[in-house]
């Protein structure tokens, strides 16, 4: 490709509304342009990267035995009503009616559609297992689209769905997808980790996320420092304290705390160790419960894990925090003064809270706290559960080492769905014994557009993007200095350009009448891994300058060797 025949829409300034580095660089490098909130046009440079990501995904899915299909973006509401997700999914599901007053949705995912297809196409266990995938546009009406294509409303996704008659067969395909995903992200040159994860709104049992490590990541991922344990913080078990609860040394006293409405204020004003405080959060109780609310208690320096809390039988799903009015109606005190003593609604405490003694908590009286609370003396020990986020330094749940926490960007997710959708949509085949058998399913997703942003978050410097070779928009940039004035520069540039293309290498030749500084800045901003600079001065010595974008290393290479050097060093 020649820049004179290409749309090279680079920007010098960073757009003010771009929050994260990937969004900033995708705009500056001319990869995307915003059309509306959460909607982006992909320009040629961005589309080249997107297609390379897509091709790697497609190759590895095909290698793993998956079969490509294409399903409609628009889906009839009846399928979502049949599965039960019409009510469950929430406002992210864009719903509309056509001119015939029939209800439809814009698909955020395709479990219902593929299950409907399979229940009508398959009849015997002999046709299974099968694994279908597509790479297709999805739409989720995000309440607050942000971070460019990292959290957009319209996005490209690879979604796959497998069907089985046994759990063993599902496990084999799940393992094959785990391996395929590992190959996909390795080929893309990404530093990633597969981690145990929650199944979320998709449903099912076993689940793994593939997380690209990056400081800007939205997820906290947890690792053991000595074993292979890795999990999303939502799922990581907080191991119960190993030391027994200390004996009481204080009497419980009622203390006036009119200006201490938060744990931080309580600690500061009364010089308390934060690990000796307890915070109480009230959430709505499950439907049909005797009480309207449930009190959840965690240590003052810990955070409630909402995913764990939502799984408690007495807690409403989705987890909903009580309003101040609801709290006052149930407890007769405000949110800043809540605690376990005389709490009139059911209480669940975290394991770490159960191990505390002589602790401080709200007195369920406005402006007052109890200090020196002890379990089984001042208040009976209530239900104990793991309801907090782990913190760095906690013991690893596998009993090996301690936990580290890093930020990650989720780019892939695999699920063992079981029979959630096949039960709801009555998808079955005739089993080996002649009886009807409900199908077992797996679901496997990759956020193709998200991968592009995640790769940039992990691969950039002060000058721009630093693409891994496999997904770079171009692998080689040719920068001929003053080619319009020098015949030999032009001749050699054209020759090298043709030879690289003949070798199947993606090459961009900058044939603009631009200053060298502009040419260098654009190529570094775009992030092309390999750059060759052809100039009269170096040609006097029969040499060409080569620069590797990732480490900035420059070297002089003989003109007769440059083609072989590039062919040997470009990773494909």
Swiss-Prot record:
GO cellular component terms listed in the entry, alphabetical order: cytosol
E.C. numbers: 6.1.1.15
Gene3D superfamilies: Anticodon-binding domain, Bira Bifunctional Protein, Domain 2, YbaK/aminoacyl-tRNA synthetase-associated domain
Entry's Gene Ontology BP terms: prolyl-tRNA aminoacylation
The UniProt record lists the keyword Signal: no
Reactions it catalyzes: tRNA(Pro) + L-proline + ATP = L-prolyl-tRNA(Pro) + AMP + diphosphate
InterPro entries attached to this UniProt entry: aa-tRNA-synt_IIb (IPR002314), aa-tRNA-synth_II (IPR006195), aa-tRNA-synth_II/BPL/LPL (IPR045864), Anticodon-bd (IPR004154), Anticodon-bd_dom_sf (IPR036621), Pro-tRNA-ligase_IIa (IPR002316), Pro-tRNA-synth_IIa_bac-type (IPR004500), Pro-tRNA-Synthase_IIa_type1 (IPR023717)
Compartments (UniProt record): Cytoplasm
Keywords linked to the UniProt accession: Aminoacyl-tRNA synthetase, ATP-binding, Cytoplasm, Ligase, Nucleotide-binding, Protein biosynthesis
Enzyme class: ligase
A molecular function GO annotation: aminoacyl-tRNA deacylase activity
Free-text note on domains in this protein's UniProt record: Consists of three domains: the N-terminal catalytic domain, the editing domain and the C-terminal anticodon-binding domain.
HAMAP family, per the entry: Pro_tRNA_synth_type1
Task performed by this protein: Catalyzes the attachment of proline to tRNA(Pro) in a two-step reaction: proline is first activated by ATP to form Pro-AMP and then transferred to the acceptor end of tRNA(Pro). As ProRS can inadvertently accommodate and process non-cognate amino acids such as alanine and cysteine, to avoid such errors it has two additional distinct editing activities against alanine. One activity is designated as 'pretransfer' editing and involves the tRNA(Pro)-independent hydrolysis of activated Ala-AMP.
NCBIfam families in the record: PRK09194.1 (NF006625), proS_fam_II (TIGR00409)
Binding partners and assembly: Homodimer.
Family: Belongs to the class-II aminoacyl-tRNA synthetase family. ProS type 1 subfamily.
PANTHER family linked: MITOCHONDRIAL RIBOSOME PROTEIN L39/PROLYL-TRNA LIGASE FAMILY MEMBER (PTHR42753), PROLINE--TRNA LIGASE (PTHR42753:SF2)
Protein name (database record): Proline--tRNA ligase
Gene behind the chain: proS
């Amino acid at each position: 490709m020649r820049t004179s025949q290409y749309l090279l829409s680079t920007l010098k300034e960073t757009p003010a509304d771009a929050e994260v580095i990937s969004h900033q660089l995708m705009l500056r490098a001319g990869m995307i342009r915003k059309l509306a909130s959460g909607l982006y046009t992909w320009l040629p440079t961005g589309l080249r990267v997107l297609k390379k990501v897509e091709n790697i995904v497609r190759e590895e899915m095909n290698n793993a035995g998956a079969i490509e299909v294409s399903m409609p973006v628009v889906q009839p509401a009846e399928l979502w009503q049949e599965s039960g997700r019409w009510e469950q999914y929430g406002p992210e599901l864009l719903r509309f009616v056509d001119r015939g007053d029939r209800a439809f949705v814009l698909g955020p995912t395709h479990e219902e559609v593929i299950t409907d297809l399979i229940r009508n196409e398959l009849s015997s266990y002999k046709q299974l297992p099968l694994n279908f995938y597509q790479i297709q546009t999805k739409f989720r009406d995000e309440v607050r689209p942000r971070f460019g294509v990292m959290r957009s409303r319209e996005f490209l996704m690879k979604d796959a769905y497998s069907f089985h008659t046994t759990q063993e067969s599902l496990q084999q395909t799940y393992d094959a997808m785990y391996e395929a995903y590992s190959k996909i992200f390795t080929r893309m040159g990404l530093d990633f980790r597969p981690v145990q994860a929650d199944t979320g709104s998709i449903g099912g049992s076993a689940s793994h996320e593939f997380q690209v490590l990056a400081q800007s990541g939205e997820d906290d991922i947890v690792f053991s420092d000595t074993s292979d344990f890795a999990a999303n913080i939502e799922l990581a078990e907080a191991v119960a304290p190993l030391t027994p609860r200390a004996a009481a040394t204080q009497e419980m006293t009622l203390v006036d705390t009119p200006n201490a409405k938060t744990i931080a204020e309580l600690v500061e004003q009364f010089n308390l160790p934060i690990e000796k405080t307890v915070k109480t959060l009230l959430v709505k109780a499950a439907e049909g419960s005797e009480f309207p609310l449930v009190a959840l208690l965690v240590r003052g320096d810990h955070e409630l894990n909402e995913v764990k809390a939502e799984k408690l039988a007495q807690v409403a799903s989705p987890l909903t925090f009580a309003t101040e009015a609801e709290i006052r109606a149930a407890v007769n005190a405000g949110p800043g003064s809540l605690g376990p003593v005389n709490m009139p609604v059911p209480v669940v405490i975290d394991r770490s809270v159960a191990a505390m003694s002589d602790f401080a908590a709200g007195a369920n009286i406005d402006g007052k706290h109890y200090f020196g609370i002890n379990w089984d003396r001042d208040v009976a020990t209530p239900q104990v559960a793991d309801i907090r986020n782990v913190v760095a330094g906690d013991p690893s749940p596998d009993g090996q080492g301690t936990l580290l926490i890093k930020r990650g960007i989720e780019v892939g997710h695999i699920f063992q769905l079981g029979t959630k959708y096949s039960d709801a949509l009555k998808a079955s085949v005739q089993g080996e014994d002649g009886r009807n058998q409900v199908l077992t399913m797996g679901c496997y997703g990759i956020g193709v557009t998200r991968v592009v942003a995640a790769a940039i978050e992990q691969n950039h410097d002060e000058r721009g993007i630093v693409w891994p070779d496999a997904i770079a928009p171009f692998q080689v940039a040719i920068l001929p200095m003053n080619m319009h004035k020098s015949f030999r520069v032009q001749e050699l540039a054209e020759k090298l350009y043709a030879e690289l293309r003949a070798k199947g290498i993606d090459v961009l030749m900058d044939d603009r009448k631009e200053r060298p500084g502009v040419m260098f800045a654009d190529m570094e901003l775009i992030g092309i891994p390999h750059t060759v600079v052809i100039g009269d001065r170096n040609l006097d010595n029969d040499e060409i300058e080569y620069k590797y974008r990732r480490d900035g290393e420059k070297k002089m290479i003989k003109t007769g060797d440059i083609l072989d050097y590039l062919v040997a060093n470009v990773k494909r």
